[in-house]
Amino acid sequence: MIFEEDFTKKYEDFITVRFLLASKMRPSLLLMLSDSDCNLNDFREELEKPSASILHGLKELERINLIKKNFKNYSLSTKGILCSASLEKLFQDLYIFQINRDFWQNHSIDSIPQDAFRKSYLLRDSVFVESDEHNLSKAFNKYLDLIGACGDMKIILPIFLEEHLEIILENLENGDNLLLITNEDVFSSLKSSKYYEELVDFSKKGQVSIRKADHDLKVFLTVCDDFMSLSLFYKDGLYDNSCFILNEQKDGIEWANILLDKYLENSIKML
């Protein structure tokens, strides 16, 4: 019974959103009202549309209980407040994927769980960093500069990179901490590398924790106190070190922690 009620609610929400998006006028009216109550003149000035079109849209929103009218003013109903908030998040999500379209379209995103995608609006202030023909290492060098100056590090590491590990060890020597989530191949490479004994020593001091994911990794994620970065694999399985998403805002770092926690839940401690 609870499942049926939940399904019915989600279906009704879907129908409402689909109804709103079938018109340019309806979402515009709803989002205006999310800022403040408005009258017909307010709508006319902002939208530059004739009164007849605006009134038609308002009546449609009133009919499905998203807005209410009090004399000459219109305001959101309780249902309308919730719907407008969902609509704003949807538009923010679409904007994020639009401005970085090539990044998302050209790479595999199968390793990013739905929970993270539902909150992708948190990435709205991200910067796309990309190498070019004049500097093929531009993106990776930018990443190394960033991680070299950060404090505590939480990293999902799907590939073995010596340059990367050398900088991490320098940070550890400065007293920073590392949480590393990786796969079987990278962990095996770490164990046979010249860096492993140092990592073991730092682990004994409580500075390092290395965990192994129980499935293949197709994301390279770094989370620090003041930035996050995300790079992905091509759809053919090759890692792309030529570009990454960078975010230095609180919301972007929150999104990265959501993604990292999902992998943390499905990992086992190795060191």
Question: Which residues are covered by each model-predicted region?
Answer:
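HKD-type phospholipase D/PLD-like phosphodiesterase module
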Residues: 185-220
